[in-house]
């Protein structure tokens, strides 16, 4: 994390990775480390999808959440499952479980607001104080990354707003409270995707195969990535929708319209004056 400067940036990323647990401590031996860190890892468990509940194989919940201790426990105890003909679809396994401690664990009914308030608000505050900050959604396809980060559904529910729109509202709320004749703010936004190891500009699709560079003034940046001056949350939402429409998508076994690329939405806020 860098020292405070008049310029700060907030990156919100959507990335995909499978979660795998190896040999890990049991619940009784798990302890929560008490230390300050620049990185925090949180886990959000999503509810089962309708197709998972109505599938041929009965749905089994193997995840237990202890929000008070921030512990996630994965059980490997699989009961015998048979189909309509009496044929075994799964065989019993040894009863065992693995527990993992995180900075925060959210159960499947956690609201978008609670996720933002306990996870993201402090990160945005850091960006507004001049530090670079990143919020990074990590998970297998179909686990709810897009819902957590963007949150908008077909009904446009206000309660369903995700981290990005809530962060934008926080940024512009800060600007409204602190702007005066001696101080003004400049907010810019960019949107990129990484697909097949190539970086392209989602807001200028003709710009592809962009390169990552670094210099003393800008730090790490994507050369040629367009930046758009925005004056309201509505303008940013428009850029998100515009960029999202050209993202690479494709069907997978887990998701009929899976995002096949990694996406990064970047907001840069600059303060001019004192």
Identify the function of each model-found stretch.
Residues 52-66, 204-208:
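Short Gly/aromatic-enriched secondary-structure transition segments
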Residues 36-48:
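Short acidic, low-complexity intrinsically disordered linear motifs used
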Residues 1-25, 29-38, 68-274:
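P-loop NTPase motor catalytic core
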Residues 49-51, 232:
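Ser/Thr-centered flexible coil motifs
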């Amino acid at each position: 994390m860098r020292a405070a400067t008049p310029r700060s940036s907030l990156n919100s990323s959507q990335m995909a990775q499978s979660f795998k647990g190896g040999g890990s401590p049991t619940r009784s031996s798990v302890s929560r480390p008490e230390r300050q860190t620049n990185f925090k890892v949180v886990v959000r468990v999503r509810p089962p999808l309708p197709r998972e509940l109505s599938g041929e194989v009965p749905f089994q919940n193997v995840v237990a959440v202890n929000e008070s201790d921030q512990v996630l426990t994965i059980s490997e105890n699989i009961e015998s499952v048979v189909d309509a003909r009496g044929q075994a679809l799964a065989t019993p396994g040894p009863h065992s479980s693995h527990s993992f401690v995180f900075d925060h664990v959210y159960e499947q009914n956690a609201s978008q607001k609670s996720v933002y308030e306990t996870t993201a608000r402090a990160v945005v505050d850091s960006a507004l104080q001049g530090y670079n900050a990143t919020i990074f959604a990590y998970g297998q396809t179909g686990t709810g990354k897009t819902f957590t980060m963007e949150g908008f559904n077909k009904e446009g529910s206000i309660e369903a707003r995700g981290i990005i729109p809530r962060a934008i509202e926080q940024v512009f709320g800060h600007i409204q409270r602190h702007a005066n004749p001696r101080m003004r703010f400049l907010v810019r936004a960019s949107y990129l995707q990484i697909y097949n190891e190539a970086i392209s500009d989602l807001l200028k699709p003709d710009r592809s195969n962009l390169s990552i560079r670094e210099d003393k003034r800008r730090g790490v940046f994507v050369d040629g990535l367009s930046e758009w001056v925005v004056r309201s949350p509505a303008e940013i939402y428009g850029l998100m929708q515009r960029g999202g429409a050209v993202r690479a998508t494709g069907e997978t076994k887990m998701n009929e319209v899976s995002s096949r690329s990694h996406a990064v939405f970047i907001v840069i806020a600059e303060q001019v004056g004192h």
